[in-house]
């Protein structure tokens, strides 16, 4: 199965009538494995910041989580495993796997919990597969 299928069918899927705004699977080196059509272009320093926060949890809290130039306020996550960000009525969830970052971005009417469930479910599956 291609990485694009994971994005299209597992991240951009419908949940209770709602969809993520955009999603991607990114290598921890910043390489794009697959992304939705409207996923913002990640900058190298944004990927470095995300990877750095997984290695040393809490480093993004003072500065914010940046995805494609958009700043998200870092909210509670799972240190070393999940980073969650909020911006107005929307937000983002980043799940770290052994080799990748699974990223979902949402806006109303999707809830933070729905985004977390979609992103973390795929991330956990990839971890179980050794990825």
Curated annotation (Swiss-Prot):
UniProt xrefs under SUPFAM superfamilies: Profilin (actin-binding protein)
Pfam family, one: Profilin
This protein's record includes keyword Cytoplasm: yes
Annotated CDD domains: PROF
Subcellular location: Cytoplasm, Cytoskeleton
Gene Ontology MF term list: actin monomer binding
Transmembrane region(s): none
CC terms in the record's Gene Ontology section: cell cortex; cytoskeleton
Keyword Cytoplasm: yes
Keyword entries, A-Z: Actin-binding, Allergen, Cytoplasm, Cytoskeleton
Major location (coarse): cytoplasm
Quaternary structure and partners: Occurs in many kinds of cells as a complex with monomeric actin in a 1:1 ratio.
Similarity field: Belongs to the profilin family.
Summary of the function given for this chain in its UniProt record: Binds to actin and affects the structure of the cytoskeleton. At high concentrations, profilin prevents the polymerization of actin, whereas it enhances it at low concentrations. By binding to PIP2, it inhibits the formation of IP3 and DG.
Protein name, per record: Profilin
Organism encoding this protein: Cucumis melo (Muskmelon)
Taxonomic classification: Eukaryota, Viridiplantae, Streptophyta, Embryophyta, Tracheophyta
């Amino acid at each position: 199965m291609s990485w694009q299928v994971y994005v299209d069918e597992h991240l951009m899927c419908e949940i209770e009538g709602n969809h993520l705004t955009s999603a991607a699977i990114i290598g921890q080196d910043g390489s794009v494995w697959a992304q939705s059509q409207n996923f913002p272009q990640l900058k190298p320093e944004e990927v470095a910041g995300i990877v750095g926060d997984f290695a040393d949890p809490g480093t993004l809290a003072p500065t914010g989580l940046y995805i494609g130039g958009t700043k998200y306020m870092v909210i509670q996550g799972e240190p070393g495993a999940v980073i969650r960000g909020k911006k107005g009525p929307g937000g983002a969830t980043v799940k770290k796997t052994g080799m990748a970052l699974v990223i979902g971005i949402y806006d109303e009417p999707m809830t933070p919990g729905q985004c977390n469930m979609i992103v973390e479910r795929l991330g956990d599956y990839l971890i179980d597969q050794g990825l």
